[in-house]
Amino acid sequence: MIITTSNDEDKKTNVFVELAAGSFSGALTRFIVAPLDVVKIRLQLQRTQLNNNSNNNNKIIGKENVNYRGIINTMSKVIREEGIRSLWKGNFSAELLWVTYAAIQFSTYNEIIGILDPEYRKHQQRTDKDKPNYKPSSSITMIGGASAGILSTIVSYPFDIIRTNIVNNHNKTNFKQTFKTIIARNGGYSNLFSGINSSLFQIVPQMGFQFTFYETFKFISNKYTSSVNNNNNNPLNQFTCGLLSGAISKFLVLPFDVVKKRLQVNEKVGYGMKSCFRDLYFNEGGVKAFFKGGTPGIVKAGLAAALSFTFFEQSKRILLNKQ
């Protein structure tokens, strides 16, 4: 006979709460940041054409021939040419992506940190306003964030591929059509994981940095605000810390995001990360090519992290209080 301890029950409950809170957070966050995501993808995927002239320093010169320029220009052009609903293009697959990703990410992160640092688990289970300020070590949060990023990326990646291809298609299309088109290419079902190496190169450090920055900023913020309002569940603190952690970590890995998006819509067999890096550098303007869509990408990442952390922390607190 197996005896279930109250500790085991609490652990199970906590995992389900984190999955539910993560799913809710992912769904709501995605809906809000969808327009910025569409703008970012359009900017990242457009090919920059430069003339082949060069000056005495062997630098490429000439005017860039591009369709989209900046957030406002791209957003207004997409609305004008494709309608305002196109800012939520591919939203079904994107919602599946974000719900799956956020649920796995938050629950995995908290489980790993809880194993490596039992004190953190005790702290997370407390919902009272008087709980003490606590931060796990940066090495532990880096491991937890990176591990959560790996697992959530692998599980949700096919939805990311489908979403990117839908957004890249200027004509009307849907989830089913796009799925069939992707697997009909050379490579079949493996195309649903095209560019995953670049994605993991991006996501491992990004999530490691993001959770580490978030825990650090939150600890500092709570240290100075909890003495004033006696509340380290302050949503404004969570939003601000999430905004900073998301924007900084995204900037650090932006080149890998550009390469990942290019590989996701690529139809050439044998065209990998190395070839993509080389083409971007030599054919599309050097180093700056790796920061295409950088502004909307960083703004979106900051806003997404701010909303995601806030929605997760607040919904988790509500769910735990209801038990």
From Swiss-Prot:
It catalyses: thiamine phosphate(out) + thiamine diphosphate(in) = thiamine phosphate(in) + thiamine diphosphate(out). GO terms for molecular function: antiporter activity; thiamine transmembrane transporter activity. It is a multi-pass membrane protein. The keyword Transmembrane applies. Solcar repeats lie at residues 13-115, 136-220, 233-318. Keywords: Antiport, Membrane, Mitochondrion, Repeat, Transmembrane, Transmembrane helix, Transport. It holds the Pfam family Mito_carr. It is found in: Mitochondrion membrane. The chain crosses the membrane at residues 15-35, 96-116, 142-162, 191-211, 239-259, 293-313. InterPro entries: Mit_carrier, Mitochondrial_sb/sol_carrier, Mt_carrier_dom_sf. GO terms for cellular component: mitochondrial inner membrane; mitochondrion. Its main location: mitochondrion. GO terms for biological process: thiamine pyrophosphate transmembrane transport. The keyword Transmembrane applies. PANTHER family: SOLUTE CARRIER FAMILY 25. Belongs to the mitochondrial carrier (TC 2.A.29) family. Mitochondrial transporter mediating uptake of thiamine diphosphate into mitochondria. It is not clear if the antiporter activity is affected by the membrane potential or by the proton electrochemical gradient. This is Probable mitochondrial thiamine pyrophosphate carrier.
